[in-house]
């Protein structure tokens, strides 16, 4: 099933250095879900890696003039008036290509923040987000996923591991040159792998995409997420897709346009 509609209107493009969101510093300091969620979608590289995990071949085949329109933290009934559970949609993501909304590939994500500590790495989350994801499936959204965004403290340096640093010599051939060995805190990888394993083990519906992403704070860099592709929801209808489009048309200025490729610079 493929269903597209004209984009008609487009949010303003946010360039390097532009203000995207204003976030209350109190929410940032306490690592609130909204603050972390907004910071996550502003990290376009990390967001793109997660989107690729959840949408698989579709992402790989997206063309030069394509991208995603992201709306965070929406009251559910504003999109589907009769919808009551879950009460909100953490991320609504509508892909586009050549000024066409690809509504049949729209993705909604249920976000959970996982606050880990070195001394409690084995602790399971209180909630996985699957009940909310099931509600999103029952409401007819075409693709649904649960994302665990992981934050943590740092491991003691005595637990850091030896890793190799490599330099890319030839990007086309993939040739690299090993430079040196350094000590690195590899706990983020362990947390993602463990978290993803729990998601897979507890997931009640194969249609639900799964994503475990480490959100590095300060200068820890980006870590590639663990994920499983979402599958098309057979409860989706054209009526639901039209409601998603109508919501976009009425609120397009509040969506974040994240392109797959940087814009082509004109001479």
Model segments located where?
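Charged, low-complexity C-terminal accessory regions
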Residues: 179-267
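Nucleic-acid nuclease catalytic cores
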Residues: 125, 134-218
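Surface-exposed intrinsically disordered loops and tails
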Residues: 52-76, 175-185, 219-228
């Amino acid at each position: 099933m493929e269903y597209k509609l004209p984009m008609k209107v487009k949010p303003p493009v946010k360039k390097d250095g532009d203000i995207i969101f204003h976030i209350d510093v109190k929410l940032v300091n306490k690592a609130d879900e909204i603050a972390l969620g907004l910071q996550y979608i502003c990290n376009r590289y990390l967001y793109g890696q997660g989107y690729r995990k959840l949408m698989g071949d579709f992402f790989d085949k997206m063309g030069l003039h394509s991208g995603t329109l992201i709306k965070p933290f929406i009251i559910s009934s504003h999109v589907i008036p009769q919808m009551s559970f879950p009460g909100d949609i953490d991320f609504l993501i509508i892909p586009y290509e050549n000024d066409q909304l690809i509504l049949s590939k729209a993705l909604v994500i249920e976000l959970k923040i996982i606050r880990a500590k070195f001394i409690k790495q084995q602790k399971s989350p209180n909630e996985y987000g699957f009940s909310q994801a099931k509600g999103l499936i029952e409401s007819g959204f075409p693709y649904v996923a649960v994302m665990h965004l992981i934050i943590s403290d740092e491991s003691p340096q005595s637990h850091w591991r030896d890793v190799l640093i490599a330099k890319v010599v030839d990007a086309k051939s993939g040739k690299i040159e090993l430079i040196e060995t350094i000590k690195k805190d590899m706990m983020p990888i362990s947390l993602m792998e463990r978290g993803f394993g729990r998601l897979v083990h507890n997931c009640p519906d194969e249609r639900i995409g799964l994503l475990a992403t480490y959100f590095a704070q300060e200068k820890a860099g980006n870590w590639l997420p663990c994920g499983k592709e979402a599958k098309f929801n057979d409860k989706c209808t054209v009526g639901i897709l039209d409601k998603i489009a109508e919501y976009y048309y009425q609120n397009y200025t509040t969506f974040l346009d994240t392109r797959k490729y940087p814009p082509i610079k004109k001479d």
